[in-house]
Structure formats: C-alpha cells, structure tokens
C-alpha cells in the first residue's frame, strides 16, 4: 500500500530482504546526486527508490524507510508488503517463474517480516542489553532479526505464532524437555567415554532426577523437545512403537532450557551439556533435522581430540576450543532403521558451565544491526572498551578487530593449512570469549560443519578414519571456507563497526588482510590463503534465489548451484 506518512525509520527485516537481493543482482544503481538513493527499476515507467543511510563495500547497507515508488505521475512512499510484491512480480516476469512458486515465496517473506516486527515490538528490553557485558544465555537470545542476507530470515514453517513464541529464541523463552520411557532395543547411538545406557542415565539424573524411578535395565529415559515429541506422535513408525508398548510418554519434566540462536540447540546454565535436537521445522533454507552422517562427524572430531595431533594444535592455540559432541542418540523403528527426526546430540560445554556469567557471546548477536536503530551490541562493547582503556573509539575498534583476528581467524586458517582440519565457522558457530569487552578466546560449536583436507589423512588414520566421508576437495574448500569465515562472519564485524563510523570498512578489512598475509607466511599449505588474498572473486551463497526457488539446502544434490561469484573485498585492501 501507499503510505500516508514519510517518517524515516529503521526497518531491519526489510533491510535483510533488500541486501540479500542487492548482493545477488546487478540491475540496481546508485543515484548520481544527493540525497543518496539506491534505485531498483521495475520497468520502463516505474522504479523503487531507497534512501541510503550507509553504503557498504560488503553489501551490509543501511536504509532509511519507507521506500518510494517513483512513476511518471510522482513519488509515493510504500510499505514492505507493496515493495516486496513489486520486486517479486518483476523477478517472476524476468525469470519466467511459476506463479505458485512466487506466491509461496511472498507469503513466507511476509510471515518472516511480521514475526520480526512482533518480536521487536515485544522485546522492549533489547536496548538495555547494550549497557553491559552479556553472558552466554543473554547473547543467544539477543538475535531478533536473523541472517542479514536472507529474504525471510525468521521463517519457521510449520510453527504457528504460539509455537514460535515458545520454541524460538526471539522472545527469550525457556521450557523443559519432554521425556519418554523407551525399550532399549529401540534406542541407537554412540558414546565415546560411557556406554549408551550410562550416558542417557547421567543426562536424566542431572536434568530430570524426578523421573529416575521410571528407569530399568530394559527401559531407558529418552528426551525430546516438546514440539518434536508431538511431531513424532504423528509419524506412522512412532505410532507403531507406542502401539507395541515400546515407548511411553512421561510428559514434560526437569530443568528449563532456553533455545539458542540456531533454534534447534538448547542451553541450560546448570547442565554440563548443551543439546542439539533434530527439529522438523524449515528455518530459512533447510529443514533442521540431523542425520547420522552429521552426528558421526561430531564423534570423529571427539576421537581426534584424544590424539597427539590435537594436543599439538591446542598447544599452539591454547585459547581456541571446540565444543565436543562426543555422543548421540536416536530412536529405531520396528525394522531397526535409525530415524533421523529423533536424533539428539549433547555437546560438552564444561567451559561455559564453570563460568556461566562469563562474557562468551555468539558473534551473530554482536553484529546484528540494532533492531530499533542505533548501535549494535558489538559497537556498544567497543565503546565500553574505549571508555575503560581511555582510548578513542577508532583505537578500540582496531584493538577489537586485531584481537578477533588473533583469536578466531588465525587458529582456523592455521588448522586448515597445517593440520587439514576445516571448521566452517559462520556467525552462529563462533563464540567469542571476551574479558572486559576484548576478545581473549574462541569456542567453535556445531561439528556437523567440520571437514578435512587430504593432508589430514595421516592424522585421520590414527583413529582409523582415513576414508572419512567429509574429506574436502580443493574446490569445496575454496567455495565454503572463505564464505563462512570471511564473508558471513568477519565482514559482519568490519561492517558493523564501519556503519557506526568507528572507522571505514576499508581500513578495518586492511587489518584483516594484514593478519591473513602474516598467517600465510607461517603455514605449510597455502592454497586457501593464496586464494583468499589473490583471487579476484570468491564464491558466496545466494540465499535470496535459493529461497525463491524453494531449495532445501540440506538435501540439494549439488550445493554449488546456489553459489555465485563475489568480488574479493580484500583485493582493494592490498598494502
């Protein structure tokens, strides 16, 4: 609709949609005269104009809404429903897309947009988070907008509004697990340090001790997220288990857990475990069910962590840790098949348990644009650092970026180059440990994003895994690793600081380039760093068209089809 008011405002949900589109298309332009506007032509007679508050060399643009529809008869402010409809109609005609596909896409986009607006309106406490260092749980539930380059970053089919409010992190909820008594013959899994019965019993004893009287040698306690439990009840294979008395519902019980930024992982400050469940919900590009292949990757890393090679890596980078996923469990159907929608994997989080109030923050919450406008949580931290040290905000920004490079980038690039260990660290996987707002350590989580290069074969052979399924080719390494670690994560840091005027993105990226050049001089296998520093283009994931074309990223046969060439921002930062 055309709006009656032209009051300028922040609209972070619209910004995510727009930046995803701009990154993946070329038929837009900047106005040649003030005020600064980005123009998207719709046809020969009309175009959309967006007031640019900050133009980013890495496409983390900031806009002042509303947008304007400009036609031969004038300029009119329009709301998000209208501007998104106009853009989708243009793409449908340009690309000859089916009408039902575009209608489904638009509906999902609008549902995500509405959810984000409802969350922002409800979370009046968010601005207070800027005022102090956050603990782990607070940071996990500070993410209100989701992926900065996605047309529907808060999509969550098939959750309804009430389910979304209870089970997604946005409204800062917490809830107990739903427990089941299961015949041991229907439980599959693996545990590195205990047998499976001992592992499940320990988890139940620590998190739902009131249910221990339900335990026996043949009946084990098995937890699920409450929603996933309801979902499994509707599956034929699970109904068959109930019918034969092989599984009984014990209801919700025990300690409360809060959903983290990934939504499917849960955290409890008093538990030694962080738990990751299959969740049969489509969040952004994929249905978030685990697979046996993925949980076995966690076991592979956990076994490697017992080797001398891992201890050598740890000695080089003592402030770098991997949150180990050293066991997993799931249900079998009557035919003995492991059902992936029932899988869960506890992750060892002793570091967080020992210091639950420590400033260990997930990167994506730090870098997200302020939902109501104003400073991001990262910028607030840097300003506190400036005040504490009595230095300028620019100097504090340099100190933060330099520390991030040392604590996060250096160990990850070295692990790949010297050990063949690839950890695809995107913003939700990077836990920055800070002391007084300055990075002093780094925890990597979510082992499903791990892989190996061929030069890790000898190391893998020490645990009889030389033929592991997740050994990358050169092409896979260069496609995925720079995208996740630099484009998705590091440039979100430099862009957040740049948008706030603490320094230019160019200057901050030059500091990143300097660190990477130093690391290249120190490591053995330089393929990835040569590519990062010298290639004119990288591969970047295209979330807009992946989502528009209704791809499930987890099951797509060739994931490379959703990647496109992206001009290397570090090329302009040569020193």
From Swiss-Prot:
Pathway: Siderophore biosynthesis; aerobactin biosynthesis. It catalyses: N(6)-acetyl-N(6)-hydroxy-L-lysine + citrate + ATP = N(2)-citryl-N(6)-acetyl-N(6)-hydroxy-L-lysine + AMP + diphosphate + H(+). It holds the Pfam family IucA_IucC. Gene3D superfamilies: 1.10.510.40. Its EC number is 6.3.2.38. Keywords: ATP-binding, Ligase, Nucleotide-binding, Plasmid, Transferase. GO terms for biological process: aerobactin biosynthetic process; siderophore biosynthetic process. It is an enzyme of class 6 (ligase). It comes from the Bacteria. Disruption phenotype: Cells lacking this gene are not able to produce aerobactin and accumulate N-acetyl-N-hydroxylysine. InterPro entries: Aerobactin_biosyn_IucA/IucC_N, IucA/IucC-like_C, LucA/IucC-like. One of its GO terms (molecular function) is ATP binding. Belongs to the IucA/IucC family. Catalyzes the attachment of a first N-acetyl-N-hydroxylysine to a carboxylic group of citric acid to yield N-citryl-N-acetyl-N-hydroxylysine. Involved in the biosynthesis of the siderophore aerobactin which is a chelator that mediates the high-affinity iron transport systems induced under iron-stressed conditions. PANTHER family: L-2,3-DIAMINOPROPANOATE--CITRATE LIGASE. This is N(2)-citryl-N(6)-acetyl-N(6)-hydroxylysine synthase. The lineage of its organism: Bacteria, Pseudomonadati, Pseudomonadota, Gammaproteobacteria, Enterobacterales.
């Amino acid at each position: 609709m055309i709006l009656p008011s032209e009051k300028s405002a922040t609209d972070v949900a619209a910004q995510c949609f727009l930046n995803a589109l701009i990154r993946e298309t070329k038929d837009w332009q900047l106005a040649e005269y003030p005020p600064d506007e980005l123009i998207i032509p719709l046809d020969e007679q009309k175009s959309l104009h967006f007031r640019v508050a900050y133009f980013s060399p890495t496409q983390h643009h900031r806009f002042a809404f509303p947008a304007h529809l400009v036609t031969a008869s004038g300029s009119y402010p329009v709301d998000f429903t209208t501007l998104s409809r106009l853009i989708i109609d243009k793409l449908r005609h340009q690309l000859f897309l089916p009408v039902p596909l575009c209608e489904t896409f638009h509906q999902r986009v609008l549902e995500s947009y509405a959810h984000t607006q409802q969350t922002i309106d409800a979370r009046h406490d968010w601005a207070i988070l800027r005022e102090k260092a956050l603990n782990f749980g607070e940071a996990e539930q500070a993410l209100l907008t989701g992926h900065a380059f996605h047309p529907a970053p808060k999509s969550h089919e098939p959750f309804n509004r009430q389910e979304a409010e209870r089970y997604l992190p946005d409204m800062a909820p917490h809830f107990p697990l739903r427990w089941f008594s299961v015949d041991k013959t229907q439980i599959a899994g693996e545990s590195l340090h205990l047998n499976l019965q001992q592992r499940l019993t320990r988890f139940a004893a620590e998190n739902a001790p009131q249910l221990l009287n339900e335990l026996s040698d043949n009946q084990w306690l098995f937890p699920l997220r409450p929603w996933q439990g309801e979902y499994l009840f509707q599956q034929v294979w699970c109904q068959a288990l109930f019918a034969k008395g092989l599984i009984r519902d014990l209801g919700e019980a025990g300690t409360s857990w809060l959903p983290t930024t990934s939504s499917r992982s849960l955290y409890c400050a008093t538990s030694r475990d962080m738990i990751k469940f299959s969740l049969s919900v489509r969040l952004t590009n994929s249905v978030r069910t685990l697979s046996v292949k993925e949980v076995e990757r966690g076991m592979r890393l956990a076994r490697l962590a017992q080797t001398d090679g891992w201890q050598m890596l740890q000695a080089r980078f003592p402030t770098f840790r991997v949150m180990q996923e050293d066991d997993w469990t799931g249900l079998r159907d009557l035919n003995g098949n492991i059902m992936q929608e029932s899988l869960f994997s506890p992750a060892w989080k002793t570091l967080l348990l020992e210091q639950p109030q420590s400033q260990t923050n997930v990167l994506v919450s730090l870098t997200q644009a302020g939902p109501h406008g104003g400073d991001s949580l990262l910028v607030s931290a840097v300003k506190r650092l400036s005040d504490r040290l009595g230095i300028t905000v620019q100097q504090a920004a340099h100190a933060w970026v330099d520390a991030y490079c040392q604590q996060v980038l250096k160990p990850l690039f070295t692990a790949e180059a010297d050990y063949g260990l690839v950890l695809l660290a995107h913003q939700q996987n990077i836990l920055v440990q800070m002391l007084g707002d300055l990075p002093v350590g780094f925890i990597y989580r979510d082992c499903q994003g791990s892989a190996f290069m061929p030069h890790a074969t000898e190391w893998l052979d020490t645990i009889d895994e030389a033929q592991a399924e997740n050994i990358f080719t050169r092409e896979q390494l260069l496609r995925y690793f720079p995208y996740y670690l630099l484009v998705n994560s590091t440039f979100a840091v430099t862009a957040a600081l740049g948008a706030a005027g603490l320094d230019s993105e160019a200057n901050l990226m030059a500091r990143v380039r300097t660190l990477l050049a130093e690391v290249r001089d120190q490591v053995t296998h330089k393929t990835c760093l040569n590519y990062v520093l010298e290639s004119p283009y990288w591969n970047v994931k295209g979330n807009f068209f992946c989502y528009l074309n209704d791809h499930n990223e987890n099951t797509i046969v060739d994931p490379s089809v959703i990647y496109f060439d992206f001009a290397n921002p570090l090329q302009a930062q040569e020193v």
